[in-house]
Amino acid sequence: EDDHDHHHHHHHHHHHHGVGGGGGGGGGGA
């Protein structure tokens, strides 16, 4: 999923380490 997501979705929490604090919310942002 990580590789697939890396190509299509850059909004995932694992990619946006800067918003790691809001990573939980990042999932909601997705």
Swiss-Prot record:
Q: Name one GO molecular function term.
A: peptidase inhibitor activity
Please list where the region (Disordered) is annotated.
1-30
Q: What is its main location?
A: secreted
Report the record's disulfide bonds. none
Name the UniProt key words of this record, in alphabetical order.
Answer: Metalloenzyme inhibitor, Metalloprotease inhibitor, Protease inhibitor, Secreted
Whether Cytoplasm counts among this entry's keywords is no
- Indicate whether Transcription regulation appears among the record's keywords: no
- Where expressed (tissue)? Expressed by the venom gland.
According to the lineage, what is the superkingdom? Eukaryota
Gly residues biased stretches: 19-30
Q: Which GO terms describe its cellular component?
A: extracellular region
Localization terms from the record: Secreted
Basic residues bias (residue ranges): 1-18
Q: What does this protein do?
A: May serve as a metalloproteinase inhibitor during glandular storage. Their inhibition may be instantly disengaged, by dilution or physiochemical change, when venom is injected into tissue of the victim.
Q: What family does the database annotate?
A: Belongs to the pHpG family.
What name is this protein filed under? Answer: Poly-His-poly-Gly peptide 2
